[in-house]
Amino acid sequence: MTSRKKVLLKVIILGDSGVGKTSLMNQYVNKKFSNQYKATIGADFLTKEVMVDDRLVTMQIWDTAGQERFQSLGVAFYRGADCCVLVFDVTAPNTFKTLDSWRDEFLIQASPRDPENFPFVVLGNKIDLENRQVATKRAQAWCYSKNNIPYFETSAKEAINVEQAFQTIARNALKQETEVELYNEFPEPIKLDKNDRAKASAESCSC
C-alpha cells in the first residue's frame, strides 16, 4: 500500500483590524479566547492537523494585520495560499464594506492560477453581541454575487460555528491543493512555431 505524502494547506485570514481574525484562529486551534485586544503586527500563523474526508492534512493558518500599512507584505504571505478567509464584524458595517477590497487585494497579490474559482470563505463574526448592524441576508447576497462563497456567522468568544466554518475551509483548501497538484503533474505542452522548429533543427544538425 503506497503512503500518501503529507499535505500542507495554507489558509490566509483577511479583514479589517479588530474583526476577530486572531480570536477565530486561536479559538479553532487552541480552544481559547481572550478579551484583551492586541493588534497583529505583520503576520503570524498557527498550524493544526485535521482529518478531511479520511485524509490527514496540516492546516497552516495565517493571521495577517488589518492595517493598510502592512498590506505591502501581501505578496510574500499570500502566494501559495489554498483558501482565503474574509472576516467582518457584524456590528461594524464598514468592516463588511471593505470585503470587496480585501478580496481584490488578495487576488492581485496571490495571483492564483484560476482566480474565478479560487476558494474563499466569509465569516460574519461577533454574533454574540447585541448591537448587530449587518443583516444575514445582506451578507449572503454579497457572497452569492461573488461566485456563491460559503458564508458562516461566528462567535470566536462563544465558539459558535468556528469548528464548522474551518471544516469547510479545510475541505475547500484541500480541493484547491489537489487541483493544483493535478495541473502540475500534467502541464500544458509547449507549442513551437516554425521559427523555433527551424532553429531546433539547425542546432541538432551534425553537418
UniProtKB/Swiss-Prot annotation:
Name of the top EC class for this enzyme: hydrolase
Residues with a covalently attached lipid (S-geranylgeranyl cysteine): 205, 207
Mode of membrane association: Peripheral membrane protein
Motif Switch 1 mapped to chain: 28-41
Record motif Switch 2, residues: 67-82
Keyword Cytoplasm part of the UniProt annotation: no
Pfam families, sorted: Ras (PF00071)
Effect of mutating residue 67 to L: Does not abolish localization on late endosomes, lysosomes and phagosomes and does not reduce phagosomal fusions. No loss of interaction with CLN5 and VPS13A. Increases interaction with PRPH. Inhibits SARS-CoV-2 infection
Cofactor: Mg(2+)
Function text: The small GTPases Rab are key regulators of intracellular membrane trafficking, from the formation of transport vesicles to their fusion with membranes. Rabs cycle between an inactive GDP-bound form and an active GTP-bound form that is able to recruit to membranes different sets of downstream effectors directly responsible for vesicle formation, movement, tethering and fusion. In its active state, RAB7A binds to a variety of effector proteins playing a key role in the regulation of endo-lysosomal trafficking.
Protein family: Belongs to the small GTPase superfamily. Rab family.
Descriptive protein name: Ras-related protein Rab-7a
Species of the source: Homo sapiens
Lineage, uppermost ranks: Eukaryota, Metazoa, Chordata, Craniata, Vertebrata
